């Protein structure tokens, strides 16, 4: 009787875990890296027949990239060649991934694995200006929420959306490595740091006007120097031998 009860309990736990595991899998598929699906689903704008090919100039760049690796290791170039495809096209449809696999002579799955792992690869179309707002702890403590709210209000979109004119895409990201200059955002390849809501509004206005705002801190400080100014290293360092006894 004890054995029957134990088996029944084990069966119930197994069924419960099975349901939980299925839900975890569903969540992971829905909320993969960058909020995108880990798996590919054909759409009218993203399928194996979506036109994509590298330009002649980029084919030359690919060969230059491949030469950085030992002979027979073309697969090592998957990351930079995917980046090249994204810079040419703005995002990575499945056809671009297939082209990368073809050019590097690797199975397509090897390219898919990389493209779905790294959040920097855009697997759906983005606007001309891809705005990535860091909301990890240091930025959050420096009020990154106000930056995100200002952007949503100014652009009229929510996180994960693109403006109707295809000019701006807004996403929320994890740490971008500029914690000392929090709060900050990355727009395309540029970092804008030490932001206030007024700063980010001005940046958007400049981009809309076709200008390129100056990257870096908006607070006036240089790079990541102390906010109150330098307290050490206030003059050029002395040369070799400084302070050494003359007799040595």
From Swiss-Prot:
Cofactor, how bound (note): Binds 1 [2Fe-2S] cluster.
Record flagged with keyword Cytoplasm: no
UniProt main location, coarse: mitochondrion
Localization, UniProt: Mitochondrion inner membrane
EC primary class: translocase
Entry membrane topology: Peripheral membrane protein
Region entry Disordered, spans: 229-248
Record-listed Phosphotyrosine modification sites: 192
Transit peptide: 1-31
Any single GO CC term annotated in Swiss-Prot or TrEMBL for this entry: respiratory chain complex I
NCBIfam families, sorted: nuoE_fam (TIGR01958), PRK07539.1-2 (NF005722), PRK07539.1-5 (NF005725)
Family under the similarity heading: Belongs to the complex I 24 kDa subunit family.
Subunit organization: Core subunit of respiratory chain NADH dehydrogenase (Complex I) which is composed of 45 different subunits. This is a component of the flavoprotein-sulfur (FP) fragment of the enzyme.
General function of this protein: Core subunit of the mitochondrial membrane respiratory chain NADH dehydrogenase (Complex I) which catalyzes electron transfer from NADH through the respiratory chain, using ubiquinone as an electron acceptor. Parts of the peripheral arm of the enzyme, where the electrons from NADH are accepted by flavin mononucleotide (FMN) and then passed along a chain of iron-sulfur clusters by electron tunnelling to the final acceptor ubiquinone. Contains one iron-sulfur cluster.
Protein name: NADH dehydrogenase [ubiquinone] flavoprotein 2, mitochondrial
Organism expressing this protein natively: Rattus norvegicus (Rat)
